[in-house]
Amino acid sequence: MAQQGKILKEQKYDRQLRLWGDHGQEALESAHVCLINATATGTEILKNLVLPGIGSFTIIDGNQVSGEDVGNNFFLQKCSIGKNRAQAAMEFLQELNSDVSGSFVEESPENLLDNDPSFFCRFTIVVATQLLESTLLRLADVLWNSQIPLLICRTYGLVGYMRIIIKEHPVIESHPDNALEDLRLDKPFPELREHFQSYDLDHMEKKDHSHTPWIVIIAKYLAQWYSETNGRIPKSYKEKEDFRELIRQGILKNENGAPEDEENFEEAIKNVNTALNTTQIPSSIEDIFNDDRCINITKQTPSFWILARALKEFVAKEGQGNLPVRGTIPDMIADSNKYIKLQNVYREKAKKDAAAVGNHVAKLLQSCGQAPESISEKELKLLCSNSAFLRVVRCRSLAEEYGLHTVNKDEIISSMDNPDNEIVLYLMLRAVDRFHKQHGRYPGVSNYQVEEDIGKLKSCLTGFLQEYGLSVMVKDDYVHEFCRYGAAEPHTVAAFLGGAAAQEVIKIITKQFVIFNNTYIYSGMSQTSATFQL
């Protein structure tokens, strides 16, 4: 029965399991997400978390469902009017996936912060939507000190805004686009060199010759190239073209002297550029090795930094300046026997390297007084196979962003070289928050107020820019546009932002793929978006 349930789950979540694997899905299913305010944006985010099977969610909202809510929120209906908004949204969202557990709290976030701020620290991540600036600052401070990730989301007219607040977010499985294969052709390890030497391309039957893996072909002709160039690897365009020609000359000829159709040699020629990449440690990994968290290991050091330190020790000793072998090779034209033999050479070396890193992990855990079982074999293997792609994201706190002396002026001013850069929308959002603080409402919420609010909003914008010492000019068109928005939350923009926000939440929970750092702005006017470090 349990096996049948597992098969059904694999079928249900088939596509996403291919993205983040069983361990990513397990992390998702054990997560508890808190949503503050069941707005259109908030329910769209939860929809995109409930469908892939988030473990549980809690909605905090003290408001009752209004006609306006029903008009712009797909997850609220006429029959919901007058009910608590958190409860109504929870009931509809739970219908999407029976595997997910939902709950609600009929209270405002302000009251919870006043009476029980630690309430927010029980969640895996908190997502806050459409909150006032003063409430956000209080919430962000509580979560920052408790090291709970916070994602702020906001839809304002045709503008979408997200801000991630997380002290430190290490990523082992960053899944980089277009990652190069780890073939070590420029620095073959002894077992690989021995394997290459077992091939003699000059004395092979035609069938064997045309089914030799292209990795072997490049390695054999690289040895020939070295003998003619004093061991210098082809680097320039001309050198690589000459090397391709050298391989091309190795294609067998028929009785008429015409080249045979050997696809494996064509594959080798096509892969020259990527196969001859230099084996080296990326600068981002060097930065991790030189980080204080990697150098100073204590009993409180998280597993990621123990693993990073063990990796550093391996590079200095067994790796002889290199990271562990990844242990994978791409598909290629070759007979099964030759391919499997080559694959096993890389796999065995990867296992050997992982075992060496594991020995360093064991010593480090013992030296700092942590339990030997605190780092699993699975974590160790994941680290070794992704050692070239490790990432650490550190976001600034909201207090730093809003501080007069810690605001990132350079990022804002340099971005405003283009007066229509998306950063102008951030400045306008800060201005409307200032407007709300002064007038107790957002500009243009009533049609008759739009014209009179233009001057007031412009005054708020000027005051904000002067207070923060931002010598930039904002076009009047943006002031007019934000007054016309009237703080509306169009469902089309909320739906787009909901998808983007859920993606970042999943990245944080699974610790896979790389989150943005730290602000994302979407413009529905120009259909563009940008990220900023604010």
Curated annotation (Swiss-Prot):
Q: Please name the InterPro entries in this protein's record.
A: APP-BP1, ThiF/MoeB/HesA, ThiF_NAD_FAD-bd, Ubiquitin-activating_enz
Keywords in alphabetical order = Acetylation, Apoptosis, Cell cycle, Cell membrane, Membrane, Ubl conjugation, Ubl conjugation pathway
Which SUPFAM superfamilies does the entry link to?
Activating enzymes of the ubiquitin-like proteins
Q: Name one Pfam family in it.
A: ThiF
Q: Which GO terms describe its cellular component?
A: early endosome; glutamatergic synapse; plasma membrane; protein-containing complex
Q: In which tissues is it expressed?
A: Expressed throughout the brain. In hippocampus, strongly expressed in granule cells and in the pyramidal cell layer. Strongly expressed in the piriform cortex. In the cerebellum, expressed only in Purkinje cells.
Region listing for Interaction with UBA3, in residue ranges: 331-344
User: Which Gene Ontology BP terms does the record give?
Assistant: mitotic DNA replication checkpoint signaling; neuron apoptotic process; protein neddylation; regulation of apoptotic process; regulation of neuron apoptotic process; regulation of postsynapse assembly
Which residues are reported to carry the modification N-acetylalanine?
Answer: 2
GO molecular function terms here? NEDD8 activating enzyme activity; protein heterodimerization activity; ubiquitin protein ligase binding
Pathway listed for it is:
Protein modification; protein neddylation
Q: Which Gene3D superfamilies does the record cross-reference, listed alphabetically? A: NAD(P)-binding Rossmann-like Domain (3.40.50.720)
Annotated site (Interaction with UBA3):
211
Record localization: Cell membrane
Q: Which modifications occur after translation, per UniProt?
A: Ubiquitinated by TRIP12, leading to its degradation by the proteasome.
Q: Does the keyword Ubl conjugation apply?
A: yes
Q: Which residues carry this modification: N6-acetyllysine?
A: 6, 341
- Activity regulation behaviour: Binding of TP53BP2 to the regulatory subunit NAE1 decreases neddylation activity.
Similarity-based family: Belongs to the ubiquitin-activating E1 family. ULA1 subfamily.
What role does it play?
Regulatory subunit of the dimeric UBA3-NAE1 E1 enzyme. E1 activates NEDD8 by first adenylating its C-terminal glycine residue with ATP, thereafter linking this residue to the side chain of the catalytic cysteine, yielding a NEDD8-UBA3 thioester and free AMP. E1 finally transfers NEDD8 to the catalytic cysteine of UBE2M. Necessary for cell cycle progression through the S-M checkpoint. Overexpression of NAE1 causes apoptosis through deregulation of NEDD8 conjugation.
Subunit composition? Heterodimer of UBA3 and NAE1. The complex binds NEDD8 and UBE2M. Binds APP and TP53BP2.
Task: Please identify the protein, giving its name as recorded.
Answer: NEDD8-activating enzyme E1 regulatory subunit
